[in-house]
Amino acid sequence: LLNILSNYDKNYTGVISIDRKKMNKVDYLDMPVAYAMDQPSFFNELTIYENLLLIASSRKIKKQEAFDKIERILDGLGLKKYENYSPSELSKGTMQRLNNACAMIQEEKITIFDEPFSGLDPVQMKLLENVIVEFHKKEKGIYIISSHDIECLQNVCDKCLLLHNGQIREINTEEVDREKIAKILSEGE
């Protein structure tokens, strides 16, 4: 589903529209969707800062605005001390934070995070939660987060959807817990 929403997978039936534009007719670079995939890819010959600046430039974000936003993201995610590192020099958790930063810099209407908390320690998870909440308030976009970390989802989401066997079900965020989800999955409730 995430690949379809982000236009990576065009092999589906039905129609996905954003602002009345059919997404299967939109060029990938013109998609109003940013996607932090579960398998990140970076330009290892560039620094972290340069990777973020390149993405901002490709999305036509004004230079000073990009500089300011990169600083906020680096500070918020605890990446400031790594800004001159190559992505190849980073730990898995730090690469995951960079992957999330790459999606957040894009300023799209929809930002998709696929397992954004994977590989993060509890401190890094809390940093990411705070940045997601802050950016969501400021940017006013839609954030779609796919995660198995129920506690983190409760901390950042105002709606939770459960996708199971091709069916989507909305669950009240305050009521989301492992037992309820396990019951829904096992009984097909």
Whereabouts are the PLM-identified features?
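Conserved ABC ATPase "signature" region
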Residues: L53, S57, E65-Y82
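Conserved ABC transporter NBD signature motif
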Residues: G14-L29
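Helix-to-loop junction immediately C-terminal to a conserved catalytic motif
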Residues: S6
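Catalytic Walker B motif of ABC-type/P-loop ATPase nucleotide-binding domains
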Residues: T111-D114
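Conserved ABC ATPase signature
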Residues: S86-L90
